[in-house]
Regions:
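A conserved acidic, glycine/proline-rich C-terminal tail/linker
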Residues: 226-299
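Sec-dependent N-terminal signal peptides
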Residues: 18-27
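N-terminal secretory signal peptides that target proteins for export/translocation
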Residues: 1-16
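Anionic-ligand-binding alpha/beta catalytic cores of soluble enzymes and soluble regulatory domains
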Residues: 159-241
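Boundary at the C-terminal end of the N-terminal hydrophobic targeting segment
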Residues: 33-35
């Protein structure tokens, strides 16, 4: 090797080392973001009766067979964006920082709705259509940054003519590349304002001697009704176990249920088929029938249009 060649090799090595140093410095100071734990978690409304979920995971494995793939659920009711939003809020906080979550409930697939990756202040990355799915996670974990997916580079090869399966061709592909370290968060696409499309709902708040809140979800296996009222807010009413809670449930402005329910630690403290108010595993106020289905019995569902008011009846 000539002296000139040695000099060129040395210069190239210095440039590579310099680029590596710059990359590490930017990474250390949070100027670029890499999802490092190789975990991708999926949720969809696809169900498991066909091969759609398998296709999404196959795309991820093709990006990197080292990825670890998990599921939240694929049984979100069809087109139910609100339920997708709730399941994210329910579960994401239990996954380690750096996890990539791919959420696909996308009735507007192929239209002008944006495809984004939201980085939460907790360090999670949510890949999703910006259609309301991010409503609750943006509030609970906070928005660090939002980037629009640049499909000119972050789309599965030769998939441009397919306009109805972005879950496979865009979201799973981009999420896998991010989780595998093939791309940084900055390489997802252009930075957007730190806002997302939000579904309106009643946030939990104290209003005089009442607390107003929302019914974001049902404990669907058992028909328990979950609210977004945290135990700490409920405690401001100074409830006592065994005493009654006055509950009024609305669908839009229509009153669906009114009743006084005993506040209990757990289900077995009341007789079978009797109602109770309790704090659920997410530390939020909930309502149930012991060994029964509260939601079905009283025709209650969940979503942004469902609200609740609670108070403590005055003792005589």
């Amino acid at each position: 090797m000539s002296g000139k060649s040695i000099i060129l090799v040395s210069q190239n090595m210095k440039k590579k080392h310099l680029r590596l140093i710059i990359f590490l410095v930017l990474l250390a100071y949070g100027r670029i973001s890499v999802a490092q734990n190789k975990i991708v978690v999926y949720q969809t409304d696809f169900g498991l009766k066909d091969g759609a979920v398998s296709e999404m995971k196959g795309v991820a494995m093709e990006v990197s067979p080292d990825l670890k793939l998990f599921d939240i659920t694929h049984e979100i009711p069809a087109y139910n964006i609100w339920d997708a939003a709730y399941r994210l809020e329910q579960t994401v906080k239990y996954w380690p920082a750096g996890t990539v979550i791919v959420s696909v409930v996308d009735p507007g697939v192929g239209t002008s709705r944006k495809s984004v990756v939201l980085k939460t202040k907790s360090g999670h990355f949510i890949v999703s259509p910006d259609n309301g799915t991010l409503t609750l996670i943006a509030k609970s974990l906070g928005i660090a940054e939002v980037r629009e997916i640049d499909e000119s580079v972050n789309r599965r090869k030769d998939s441009q003519r397919s306009n109805t399966f972005h879950g496979r061709d865009v979201y799973s592909y981009t999420g896998a590349r991010l989780a595998a370290g093939v791309i940084t968060f900055e390489q997802v696409g252009p930075l957007l304002p730190p806002t997302v499309v939000s579904i309106p709902f009643q946030q939990a708040k104290l209003d005089g001697k009442k607390i107003k809140g929302n019914i974001p979800a049902l404990d669907v296996q058992y028909g328990n009704v979950w609210t977004n009222i945290p135990d700490t807010l409920f405690d401001q009413l100074k409830p006592k176990y065994g005493n009654s809670v006055h509950v009024v449930i609305f669908h839009n402005s229509e009153k669906v249920y009114t009743g006084d329910i005993p506040y209990s630690r757990t289900f077995g403290e009341v007789a079978d088929k009797q109602p109770l108010a309790y704090i659920n595993s997410l530390l939020q106020l909930s309502f149930a029938l012991n060994m029964g289905d509260f939601a079905k019995t009283y025709h209650i569902s969940s979503g942004g249009e469902w609200s609740v008011e609670i108070s403590i009846p005055e003792t005589k």
